Structure formats: structure tokens, C-alpha cells
């Protein structure tokens, strides 16, 4: 332990942060310890399967409307405060004050609550609904407290995105500002955060310790990646993204800078690398926090299910994944072979259940009513629904979560069968367009030695194999065209006229936009999946099913 270190700031107040504080005391550190976190309860109050105790701005939802929940949070804060002796802790929590609830963070020391800051800026866009639950204290002001002679300020998450809260805190005397966050991952977020931190520190001269929640919460994945910023705007990456860790940093108050003990090298931060870490963490935490130790994947020999299998193995380990082939009269020998090849490469158990008996049973049962009709999409969907029913039966009988394999392109235009391949509890590819599925598959094959997805799977034309010689492009535009239109319409909210003006054929745009519109009902019934884009289906895009608008 450095002889010059008199105080320690631990970023994160979860199990790892608590363990870090205990270890410091165990090894004789007698200085000030600041434990800063967004968590609303101590580690021993957070059951491993309880989503209620993950303090995210979008995580608690209508639990915040329940008086009993708010009372338990208040009681937990009292227990934490009583235990805080010899350290200073900053803990986020929903503070009920009469009929109003505040998104608050309290400073705890000497067995009591020393001060409380109430969040000023409440996000009410995208995945955030804070104005539904929280109020703003009209009399609330800056929160500045002393830690070993250093005036430390406190603002919460969205407050940092507006200049006034940080400026007011600095004017109140803060030289170092702690910013607890529950900020979910999306592409480009790291660079955006770093630029914001540099801007705020340069404007105020105060250093910042920016800490973020780590882990999956249903459709959101919090990436952690906590950073510290010197008073001159220099940003230091301090924590690995998508991984929980305890972090100790040294701060030089006279210079308002953090001393470089060990700044983290987070390795590959490419678009694909971060997307992979987001979806694998999403799968891992959804399973762990909801009590699923194992998963099932219907493996077709196509790219979507192959990518889901690779994600599942990285998230949970091969021993906890079972793949199932469900061949039909239209399944090619190549599809069966590629599924077997991938399972052998990954060490995954492979089962085979033919759908032909179930399919024939449905056809026989419906035969009298279908007499005189021509086979069409109905019979194709029946095959998918046979697969969905069989996979759900395996999940029910033997336990484990069924992962769905649909991607964002399919969910957008309805090329996923309701009660068929949409069966399952979690959708790892839900926010990845088909072109991104290909890109992510190629990237993953470059990591860690031998390919985890057979190259032939990536090379072959996509097909649902629900009729003879079927290809996706028989009824859809090429995926590079389709996804470019969808990106503009879904993610960027561009109108038909704007998309056509960008050079896309009007008839193609009309077809795609109609498919998006008429398949809203399917998306309302889809399983959750990890958000990686700036505009994911679900909470961020809330469209009515019954809708006459055609723009």
C-alpha cells in the first residue's frame, strides 16, 4: 500500500466494491474509504434472482409505485447507514417524501445519512420513464461533502448531460464530483460519454469519477466501463466494459487529477467486439438472474441459429447449452451436416427431433377443412409452429430457457413466425439486423483460434427451408438494401419521402414500410432481447397496433 495514499475511492458499491473495502481494511489501510455506487441496497440485501434491487433508471418500473417497496428501500438505507463506520459511502435509492418519490443518492458516514442529493434532470425518452415515477425537488440544491479535506460533489446520471447541475456543484465548492449512473449500452456510447466528461471538466475545473452499473436487466445491458476525468479534461479508462470489478484509484487533490496506478486496456473496442460483449452479457445475466442454468437452441444450419449458439456457449459454457436439429422434408443434407459440424466444434450436445410426424398430424387433422385448397404460407408456418411446440416441450420437460433466433430485420418485416420460431424466452439477435448478424459472425470467427461458426454457414444464401428451393430473397429485397431502408425508417425515423429521396426505389420502400407497419402486432408479443442500437424494438419504439398513419 502506497505510503502517500490517505484516501481511496472505490467505484461501485456492489459485492465487488464491498469486498474491496473489506480487503483494504484487512491489509491495514487506515485512510478514508469512499464507496460510491448506484446500487440501492448493500450486497447482502440483493438476492441473486431479484431484479428489484438492480438500481437502474429503467429497471424498477412500477415497483416504484408500490408503498411497500419504497418502505423496504428506506429500511435498507437505514441498515446500510448504520453499517457505514470508518468509510464514506454514496448509495442511490428511491426516496419517498410524502406523495413524491425522488431519484436520490445519499452520503452515508458515521452510522448515519450525512446528506442526500435529489436528481434534477429526469429523462423521459427512449427507454426512460423517470417522470412517471419521480419528482424534482424545487428546493433542491448542490450536494458537497468533505472527504479527508477534499470537497466532493454529487450529481446523478442525466444531470451530467446538462451543464447547470455540474456547474452549480462546482460553484458550491466541489473539486471532485462523483457521478453514479445506470446508463445502458448502445453503439457509440463510450465516445459520447468521454467527450461529455471532457467538456464538463474543462468547463468547471472539477475532476469527475463516473461510475456505471454493470449487467443485463431484461432488454437493457449496462456496460459499466467506469472512467475518471482530471480537472483539465483528460479522461482515463478505469474499468473494463461489461465486467464487474472492484476499482481503486488515487486522486491528487492539489492538481485535481487521478494518478495512473493502472489504467485499463480494454482490448478490442470495435463495433462488433462491443456488440458481442453486450449480447453475451445480456444472455448471461438474463439466465442467471431469472434462475436458468441451461438453455436450448433450435439449430437449423443457418446463420441466425448458428450465431445464437455461439453466443450461448460464450455466455454460459458448452455444458449448459443443448442444440436441437428439427429437420423436415425440406431440410437439406447440408443444413443437417453444418449443424452437426458446429456442435462438434463447440463441444455442444446435439439432439435431433424430426418434425415430420407432428406436421403430418396437423395436415391430417386439418385435411377435411383444407380440402380443395392450394398449399401456401399456412403450411410453411405450420412447420415452424411444429418446431416451436417441440422445443418448448423440451424446455418444459427438462428445464432450461429456450433462446429464439430471430433478428431485427425479421422482426421488422414480419419474417418470423408467431408461435413458431418466435417461441422462447429471450432473443439474443433481436436488435441486430441481418447484415449485422453476418458481420458479427465473421468477426467472432476471427477471435480465439478455430472458427466457431462453419464458414459454409456464412457463405450460403439464407433460407427458411419451408418449401422446395426457397431463398429469403425470393420475397424480400437483398438484405443490404432492406437493412439500409430499415435503419433509416426504424432507427432514424425517416419518412417514406426522405428514404426515396436518398435513392431507394419507391416501390421497394413502400413494400418494406408496409411490412413494418402491418407486423407491429407480432413485435408486441416478441420475447425481450438485448439492446445494442440507438433505437431497439420495444420500449424505445412504442407504436400502436391499430394505426391508420401511412407516413
Indicate where each model-derived feature is located.
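Beta1-alpha1 glycine-rich phosphate/pyrophosphate-binding loop at the start
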Residues: 4-63
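Short beta-strand "acidic-cap" motif of Rossmann-like dinucleotide-binding folds
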Residues: 30-37, 116, 323-325, 352
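Short, surface-exposed alpha-helical segments at coil->helix boundaries
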Residues: 47, 60-63, 74-77, 194, ...
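Enzyme catalytic cores with a strong preference for nitrogen-chemistry domains
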Residues: 61-298, 309-318, 325, 350
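ATP/NTP-dependent adenylation/nucleotidyl-transfer catalytic domains that generate, transfer
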Residues: 66-68, 148, 205, 231, ...
Amino acid at each position: 500500500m502506497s505510503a502517500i495514499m490517505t484516501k481511496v475511492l472505490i467505484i461501485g458499491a456492489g459485492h465487488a466494491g464491498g469486498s474491496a473495502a473489506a480487503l483494504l481494511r484487512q491489509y491495514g489501510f487506515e485512510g478514508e474509504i469512499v464507496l460510491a455506487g448506484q446500487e440501492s441496497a448493500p450486497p447482502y440485501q440483493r438476492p441473486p434472482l431479484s431484479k428489484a434491487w438492480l438500481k437502474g433508471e429503467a429497471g424498477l418500473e412500477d415497483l416504484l409505485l408500490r408503498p411497500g417497496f419504497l418502505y423496504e428501500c428506506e429500511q435498507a438505507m437505514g441498515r446500510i447507514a448504520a453499517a457505514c463506520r470508518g468509510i464514506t459511502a454514496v448509495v442511490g435509492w428511491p426516496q419517498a417524501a410524502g406523495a413524491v418519490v425522488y431519484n436520490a443518492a445519499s452520503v452515508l458516514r458515521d452510522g448515519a445519512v450525512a446528506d442526500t442529493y435529489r436528481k434534477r434532470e429526469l429523462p423521459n425518452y427512449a427507454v426512460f420513464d423517470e417522470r412517471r415515477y419521480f419528482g424534482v425537488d424545487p428546493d433542491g440544491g448542490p450536494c458537497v461533502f468533505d472527504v479527508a479535506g477534499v470537497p466532493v460533489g454529487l450529481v446523478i446520471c442525466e444531470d451530467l448531460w446538462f451543464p447547470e447541475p455540474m456547474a452549480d456543484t462546482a460553484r458550491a465548492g466541489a473539486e471532485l464530483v462523483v457521478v453514479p449512473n445506470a446508463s445502458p449500452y448502445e453503439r457509440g456510447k463510450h465516445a459520447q460519454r468521454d467527450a461529455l466528461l471532457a467538456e464538463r471538466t474543462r468547463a468547471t475545473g472539477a475532476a469527475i469519477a463516473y461510475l456505471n452499473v454493470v449487467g443485463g436487466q431484461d432488454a437493457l445491458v449496462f456496460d459499466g466501463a467506469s472512467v475518471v476525468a482530471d480537472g483539465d479534461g483528460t479522461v482515463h479508462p478505469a474499468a473494463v466494459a461489461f465486467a464487474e470489478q472492484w476499482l481503486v484509484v488515487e486522486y491528487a487533490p492539489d492538481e485535481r487529477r487521478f494518478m495512473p496506478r493502472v489504467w485499463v486496456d480494454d482490448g478490442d473496442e470495435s463495433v462488433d467486439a462491443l456488440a458481442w460483449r453486450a449480447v453475451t452479457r445480456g444472455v448471461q445475466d438474463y439466465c442467471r438472474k431469472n434462475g436458468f442454468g441451461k438453455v436450448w437452441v433450435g439449430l437449423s444450419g443457418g446463420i441466425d441459429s448458428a450465431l445464437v449458439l455461439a453466443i450461448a456457449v460464450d455466455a454460459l459454457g458448452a455444458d449448459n447449452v443443448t442444440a436441437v436439429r428439427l429437420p423436415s422434408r425440406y431440410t437439406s443434407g447440408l443444413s443437417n451436416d453444418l449443424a452437426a459440424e458446429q456442435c462438434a466444434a463447440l463441444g455442444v450436445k446435439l439432439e435431433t427431433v424430426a418434425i415430420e410426424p407432428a406436421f403430418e398430424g396437423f395436415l391430417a387433422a386439418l385435411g377435411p377443412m383444407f380440402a380443395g385448397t392450394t398449399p401456401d404460407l399456412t403450411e410453411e408456418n405450420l412447420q415452424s409452429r411444429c418446431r416451436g411446440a417441440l422445443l418448448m416441450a423440451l424446455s418444459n420437460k427438462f428445464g432450461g430457457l429456450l433462446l429464439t433466433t430471430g433478428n431485427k430485420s425479421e422482426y421488422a418485416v414480419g419474417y418470423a413466425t408467431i408461435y413458431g420460431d418466435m417461441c422462447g424466452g429471450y432473443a439474443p439477435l433481436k436488435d441486430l439486423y441481418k447484415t449485422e448478424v453476418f458481420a458479427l459472425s465473421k468477426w467472432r470467427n476471427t477471435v480465439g483460434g478455430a472458427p466457431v461458426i462453419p464458414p459454409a454457414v456464412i457463405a450460403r444464401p439464407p433460407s427458411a427451408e419451408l418449401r422446395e428451393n426457397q431463398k429469403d430473397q425470393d420475397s424480400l429485397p437483398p438484405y443490404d438494401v432492406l437493412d439500409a431502408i430499415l435503419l433509416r425508417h426504424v432507427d432514424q425515423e425517416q419518412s417514406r419521402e426522405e428514404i426515396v429521396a436518398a435513392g431507394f426505389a419507391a416501390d421497394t420502400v413502400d413494400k418494406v414500410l408496409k411490412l413494418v407497419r402491418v407486423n407491429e402486432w407480432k413485435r408486441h408479443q416478441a420475447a425481450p432481447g438485448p439492446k445494442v442500437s440507438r433505437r431497439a424494438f420495444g420500449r424505445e419504439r412504442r407504436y400502436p397496433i391499430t394505426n391508420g398513419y401511412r407516413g
